[in-house]
């Protein structure tokens, strides 16, 4: 049986903790979220593999919830566990180009399948995870040394996705820009022309604002 006091401490204190994060210097891209790397996907001709239907490709714009800055690149997915810090941070320094919320295509689906596949180390971790394309999301586009797109993705039980920034605002690498309440996911699209060398792989643990996802 769960101790009510322990649950309340987790829900209203531990869950919303906000530790200091120190972004590493240099030409690198840092993680926008705490959690586990769910996938590192190559994007070709504006499409990528459907996580539910084998052999079917999905338009990148549908995945992002907005128009992609480029048709080729890399998409990194990070599953934020219930134990993760749930603040999101800017992966690079730059100007906020757009903030675009998109409602769910139906109802938000549970992310429990992704959590269990990560827990039991069963790659590909995103297999049969229909929520990736269906759930509500908030997309933040940042233009710095190159354009990037960050997607805050809501879980079935998420009550709110908070975004603290607005278009034309300047952000520093590692600066907080949002918060997703309860378990959730955060994706990052890096365009091919950025020339980023990815330094992480599926299953890796990452910290928002500190873990380097790639260098350029």
Task: Give the positions of each predicted feature.
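Contiguous, well-folded functional domains in the mature portion of proteins
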Residues: 1-216
């Amino acid at each position: 049986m769960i101790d009510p006091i322990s649950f309340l401490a987790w829900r209203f204190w531990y869950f919303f903790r906000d530790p200091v994060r120190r972004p590493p210097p240099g030409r690198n891209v840092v993680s926008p979220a705490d959690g586990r790397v769910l996938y590192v996907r190559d994007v070709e001709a504006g499409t990528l593999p459907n996580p539910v239907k084998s052999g079917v490709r999905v338009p990148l714009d549908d995945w992002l919830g907005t128009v992609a800055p480029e048709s080729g690149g890399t998409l990194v997915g990070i599953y934020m566990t219930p134990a993760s810090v749930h603040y999101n941070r800017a992966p690079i320094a730059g100007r906020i180009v757009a903030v675009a919320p998109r409602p769910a295509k139906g109802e938000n689906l549970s992310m429990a399948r992704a959590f269990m596949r990560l827990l039991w180390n069963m790659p590909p971790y995103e297999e049969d995870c229909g929520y990736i394309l269906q759930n509500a999301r908030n997309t933040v586009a940042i233009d710095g040394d190159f354009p990037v797109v960050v997607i805050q993705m809501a879980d079935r039980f998420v009550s709110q996705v908070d975004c603290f920034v607005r278009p034309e605002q300047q952000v520093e690498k590692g600066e907080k820009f949002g918060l997703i309440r309860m378990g959730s996911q955060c994706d990052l699209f890096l365009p091919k022309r950025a020339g980023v060398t990815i330094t992480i792989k599926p299953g890796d643990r990452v910290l928002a604002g500190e873990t380097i996802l790639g260098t350029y």
